[in-house]
Amino acid sequence: MSLKTSFDENIKQKHKIEKPKMYKVILHNDDYTTMEFVIEILINVFNKVPANAVKITFDVHKNGIGIAGVYPYDIAATKINEVKKLAYKNGYPLKLTMGEV
């Protein structure tokens, strides 16, 4: 037992943990999705406070795109899929894309 313990103590392990690549979730403007729906998804899916959700919504309306948030790939993809399902269920053609930061 002591042999194993001394052996384990002599092993130097270097664990290099890399930060995951981050991706921005981009909302695209369209002529059909209501601003109220966009604000709702920003609050409920992307956990934005109402004032920030309104600002992002106006960015989308004014500039054609807006950043909903920045996340690791899996989280960004999950949020995009969740919003696409909600948009489809509510009859909106809301487009979201993802871009590496």
Curated annotation (Swiss-Prot):
TM stretches of this protein: none
SUPFAM superfamilies associated with the record: ClpS-like
Pfam families hit by this protein: ClpS
Cystine pairings recorded for this chain: none
GO biological process: protein catabolic process; proteolysis
Source organism superkingdom: Bacteria
Signal peptide location: none
Similarity annotation: Belongs to the ClpS family.
Subunit structure: Binds to the N-terminal domain of the chaperone ClpA.
Name of the molecule in the record: ATP-dependent Clp protease adapter protein ClpS
Originating species: Clostridium acetobutylicum (strain ATCC 824 / DSM 792 / JCM 1419 / IAM 19013 / LMG 5710 / NBRC 13948 / NRRL B-527 / VKM B-1787 / 2291 / W)
